[in-house]
Amino acid sequence: MSKKPIVLKLGKDAFGDQAWGELEKIADVITIPESTTREQFLREVKDPQNKLSQVQVITRTARSVKNTGRFDEELALALPSSVVAVCHTGAGYDQIDVEPFKKRHIQVANVPDLVSNATADTHVFLLLGALRNFGIGNRRLIEGNWPEAGPACGSPFGYDPEGKTVGILGLGRIGRCILERLKPFGFENFIYHNRHQLPSEEEHGCEYVGFEEFLKRSDIVSVNVPLNHNTHHLINAETIEKMKDGVVIVNTARGAVIDEQAMTDALRSGKIRSAGLDVFEYEPKISKELLSMSQVLGLPHMGTHSVETRKKMEELVVENAKNVILTGKVLTIVPELQNEDWPNESKPLV
C-alpha cells in the first residue's frame, strides 16, 4: 500500500497544475484513462489488486461523469472503505446523490462561493440580452439582413428595465449578486421566492412573496435554485401558464429546473417572449427547435468559464483534498452534511 494517502483525480483541469504539484508532495495522485467507462470504474474500485481500491480522497469535475456516470447509490456502495471524501469542482453538485455517501460517512464538498460573481455576470448579460432582443438582432446581423431588413435588421423592439418586476427564484449567494448588479441598470422592483423567507438583512430590499404570487407578478423570472428532487421541473407547463403573458425567463442554474419542452411550447406560442439560457435540460444535447428560435439567447454553459474563476475553483478543490489529508475534514462540506456530527470525528490521513 502507498505510504502517501491516495487521491484519485477524475477529470482534467486547466489552471491547477501548481496546486496539484504542491499536493503531490503529501499525496499519491492517480488518474484513470480517458477511455474508462462506468462499468470499468465500478469493477476496478472493487479489485484489491488495483490501486483504485486503496483510494482515500476523490476529486471530480462535471465532465468526468462520462467516465464514471453519476455518483449515485450504486457507485457509493462500490467505493472502497478507505474513501473518506469526494471533492467536486463546482457549486452545483446534482451529479452526486449525497444521501448514500452520508450513510457511508463519506464527506462531500463543493465550491459554493467562488462561482457567484462570474455566474451573476453571465446571468445579467443574458437577462439584458433577452429583454432587449439582442439575440434576435445578432442572428439577423450575421445572416446579412442589414440594411435590407430595415433599422436593427428588422428586429422587434425590446424593453427597458424601468417599471419591470424582476422575480428572483432562489435568493442565495448568486441571486443576491444578480440583484446588486441589476440595480444600476434601472431595475427597481424586485421580488423573490425561497422555501423560507430570509432575515431582512439578507433580502437586500427584495420583497418575499409566495410562489403563486411570484409567478403572477414577475415580468422577468430569474432562475437561481439548485437542482434536486424538489426543484426538478419547478418551472413547467402549469406554472408557466400562471405567469404573465410575454414573460422573460433567464436560467443560469440547472437546465432541468425547467421543463424544456414546456418552455419551448410557451416560446412558440408567445407566452414566454424570450429566454436567456446558459443551461439546458439534456445538455450537451440541445433541442434543435429550441436552438432555432431567434428569441432564445443561449450559451453553452459558460457561467463560470473565466480564467480567474476557474483557477480559483480548481485550487479550492485541491485545498479540500489537502485539508482532508492534514485534518480529516473538507473545507466546504455541502449543506446536507453541515449538521452531521460524524465529519467532525474524522481523523487526518497522515
UniProtKB/Swiss-Prot annotation:
The modification Phosphothreonine is found at T31. SUPFAM superfamilies: Formate/glycerate dehydrogenase catalytic domain-like (SSF52283), NAD(P)-binding Rossmann-fold domains (SSF51735). Disruption phenotype: Leads to higher biomass concentration after diauxic shift. InterPro entries: D-isomer_2-hydroxyacid_DH, D-isomer_2_OHA_DH_cat_dom, D-isomer_DH_CS, D-isomer_DH_CS1, D-isomer_DH_NAD-bd, NAD(P)-bd_dom_sf. The keyword Protein biosynthesis does not apply. Glyoxylate reductase that reversibly reduces glyoxylate to glycolate, or alternatively hydroxypyruvate to D-glycerate, using either NADPH or NADH as a cosubstrate. Does not act as a hydroxyisocaproate dehydrogenase even though it also has minor activity on alpha-ketoisocaproate. Belongs to the D-isomer specific 2-hydroxyacid dehydrogenase family. Present with 3280 molecules/cell in log phase SD medium. This is Glyoxylate reductase 1. It comes from Saccharomyces cerevisiae (strain ATCC 204508 / S288c). The gene is GOR1.
